[in-house]
């Protein structure tokens, strides 16, 4: 009987240790993806961005980060926005120095010089908005 009790206690301790180890490990960051432009806007608003929906931009959001002065346009990435970006690049309307940054589910347009880009990307990454496929939209 005592032998069984000892085994049960040891099993319980082992199980508790495994649970504790599992709860301390963090899953790999996969980024935040959005099902729609509205979901993206809600996420931005709840994460310190001041955002206003602008239907003239095809439902994009003009956003500023709290305390910042730079305006960025966040737009849900769809087939339409991807084809528009490609057309802007080909026509020379889009800045070819990396100001237009695209992810799989969102697009960032800075409207500012290259010196602003690192700070914007740092803020976006710190907020977990990266989706693992951030690329320059123009080569």
Locate predicted features:
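Bacterial N-terminal signal peptides that target proteins for export
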Residues: 1-10
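Active-site-proximal loop/hinge segments that shape catalytic or ion-binding/gating pockets
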Residues: 14
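C-terminal motif of bacterial Sec signal peptides marking the signal peptidase cleavage site
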Residues: 17-20
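Bacterial signal peptide processing site
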Residues: 22-25
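Substrate-binding/charge-relay-adjacent region of secreted/lumenal peptidase catalytic domains
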Residues: 29
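Short, solvent-exposed recognition patches
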Residues: 32-96
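Extracytosolic low-complexity repeat regions of secreted or lipid-anchored proteins
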Residues: 75-139
